[in-house]
UniProtKB/Swiss-Prot annotation:
Organism: Staphylococcus epidermidis (strain ATCC 12228 / FDA PCI 1200)
Keywords: Amino-acid biosynthesis, Cytoplasm, Histidine biosynthesis, Lyase
Subunit structure: Heterodimer of HisH and HisF.
Gene that encodes it: hisF
Highest taxon above the source species: Bacteria
Protease keyword on record: no
GO cellular component: cytoplasm
Enzyme class: lyase
Family label: Belongs to the HisA/HisF family.
Transmembrane segments: none
Protein name in UniProt: Imidazole glycerol phosphate synthase subunit HisF
SUPFAM superfamilies (UniProt xref): Ribulose-phoshate binding barrel
Length: 252
């Protein structure tokens, strides 16, 4: 049986880690390099950096952050946000990222997934999906631009398409659960896992260690993402893993 992963997520804006609720009301959390090294020592299995900077200067700062972090990090680092083309991917990998995460650019140019997978290997390519439940249409749809723009692309269709195009992993954020700390969107995640064979990282809703136990007991996703509950020290990676062990879940 594959051991499950616990992955802290750091949203980085203009060189600082920030966190909000449902992608809004951002507050400053701290220095990304310091936090990354803290989680490295705390037992995190991987790290995710999402660059949400609005300016070119902010994106340039992100390169410096990645380089400084990668020199001292001993766990895999996934980087996403603002990636538009193969040159951007090359730059990130050359500066220390182990994997890259594509979101809006993949929806706009699906062929980028195939090109990146063929050039760098599918193990490097994670497709991030900000999933929004449309009550009127009673279905989940992909959003872009940090969850601000709703598309007509069904999540259940898109996950299958990106796997065929060469994605090696999915990062699914349930927007209506994000930052709410009420638990993961179990039913949605379980359905996605039935449609694909690649690993899934679940994001959005993890409010305590028990939520991670429920996630792994009720779905076959590979990893759970956590942000504010770790940044605010409401729990720790070690506490989450201890609770998972108590629940009979294999951890690293």
């Amino acid at each position: 049986m594959i051991k499950k992963r616990v992955i802290p997520c750091l949203d980085v804006k203009d060189g600082r880690v920030v966190k909000g609720i449902q992608f809004q009301s951002l507050r400053d959390i701290g220095n990304p390099v310091d936090l990354a090294l803290y989680y490295n020592e705390a037992g995190a299995d991987e790290l995710v950096f999402l660059d949400i900077s609005k300016t070119e200067a902010g994106h340039d700062l992100m390169i410096e952050v990645i380089e400084a972090t990668a020199k001292q990090l001993f766990i895999p680092l996934t980087v996403g946000g603002g990636i538009q083309n193969l040159d951007d991917i090359t730059q990130l990998l050359n500066h220390g990222a182990d994997k890259i995460s594509l979101n809006s650019s993949a929806l706009k140019h699906p062929e980028l997934i195939r090109q990146a997978s063929e050039k760098f290997g599918r193990q490097c390519i994670c497709i991030a999906i900000d999933s929004f439940y449309d009550k009127d249409r009673k279905d989940y749809f992909c959003t872009t631009h940090g969850g601000k723009k709703l598309t007509d692309v069904r999540v259940y269709d898109w996950v299958q398409e990106v796997e065929l195009l060469g994605a090696g992993e999915l990062l699914i954020t349930s927007m209506h659960h994000d930052g709410m700390k009420q638990g993961f969107d179990i039913e949605h995640l379980a359905k996605i896992k039935q449609l694909v064979n690649i690993p899934i990282i679940a994001s959005g809703g993890g409010g305590n260690a028990q939520h991670f136990v429920e996630l792994f007991q009720q779905t076959d996703v590979s990893a759970g993402l956590a942000a504010s509950i770790l940044h605010d020290q409401e729990t720790t990676v070690a506490e989450i893993k201890d609770k998972m062990r108590e629940g009979g879940i294999l951890v690293r």
